[in-house]
Swiss-Prot record:
Its main location: membrane. The lineage of its organism: Eukaryota, Amoebozoa, Evosea, Eumycetozoa, Dictyostelia. It is found in: Membrane. One of its GO terms (biological process) is protein targeting to membrane. It is a multi-pass membrane protein. Residues 409-419 have a biased composition (Basic and acidic residues). It comes from the Eukaryota. Residues 262-330, 365-434 are annotated as: Disordered. This is Putative ZDHHC-type palmitoyltransferase 1. Keywords: Acyltransferase, Glycoprotein, Lipoprotein, Membrane, Palmitate, Transferase, Transmembrane, Transmembrane helix. The chain crosses the membrane at residues 25-45, 53-73, 160-180.
Amino acid sequence: MSRPSYASATKTYFHNRLVTGPDRAYFIVAMILMLIPEIPFLIFVCPLFEEWITAAIYPVSIYFWIASYIFLIQTAYTDPGIIPRGIYNDDIFAPDHRQPLFKKITVKDTKQEIKWCETCCLYRPPRANHCGICNNCVERFDHHCPWVGNCIGRRNYQTFLYFLYSLGFLCIWIMGFCVAHICIESARYRDNHPSASSAKVFQEGMNKSHYISDYNYSLWVSRFNSNPYRKSAFANFIEAFCPPRYPSFYKYTLDHEKELTTIPTPNNINGNNNNSINNNNNNNNNNNNNNNNNNNNNNNNNNINNGNSGGTTNNGYTPPISPPQMLQRQSSTIRYSLDNLRTSSNSSLGNFNNLKSSRDLNLSTISEDKPKNLSNSNNNNNTNNKNTSEDNNHSSGSDFGGDEENNEDDFKSDNDKEINSSSLSLNHELQVNV
């Protein structure tokens, strides 16, 4: 069973119009690194070429420098294409109802597998992936760039390319003028020192040429594999640099997280149903056992107060269930079973008291009927001889008393057996349930 972390690491600003990742330190370092080479270039290098080229070297350099900052900020604070999370349900995490890990779909006559994300509770679309840093599933996930501080996905891939190309052109611009300045200064130095020779720096590039050729060959072989998303070079260029503005679904994710905090828990929603069940059980116990009326009424009032304290929903909506709420629900079921155990124990105690009272009543009736039986026996045995009548009366009385004592002992033994059996069953139920 999965135990997803429901909190997302994504941060939002200005009513969810700006969406960014959690790592802000790298983003600040990237801003500083972009500032360091530009200022010395404008101060020390550009004035040397102003007399040979034109003054346009300043605005061109500043334009690409500012463009790099704009595209960097836009990429860092744009929703990369976060997919809204699914609704959390107990049936999803049950072992018998767990979702399959993979499903096969058909995309342009090509079968592909989509994977179930246990954190977001959804099947990821094709070319989507889960970012472990932001803790979100992102459409067309490319990578998580720490220097930008955000994921690179479907909605900010265009601005990320603009940032890379503007920054790359700015680096080439600065490095080109710096190399030109070095060449000019070295030429002046050679004029003053004819014996000096130029350095040779091409050995490292030749060593890397073998790796580059092998990598290009592997790309050439892999491009002929089956890919349902493969397009022409022009179509790929248009899709990368001039894509449509895709909608953002992150607001639905925020609304879903808001519902998780405002809607009451399932324990409180199902409180009325549990109370009705308890009331029916208590009413049945009241009809059977008159001695437990006060206890059952107190239990009913406590259950009703506990059910109405949390609030209920009128529209019958079942909210998402997070793992802490699942534990609350399990605890509520345990409480419900304990309440049923208490009611059953009370009913068994009532039966025990009833058996005891019935035994006492039977013993009292036997003791009252004893003199009556003796008088009847004396009246029926009329004889002429008083001695024989008295002996007969004594003998009959002794016999009757012995029989009566035997009956009383048998009745006591039977009642004691029933009481002992009921007490043993009650103790057995309490030990098992506890």
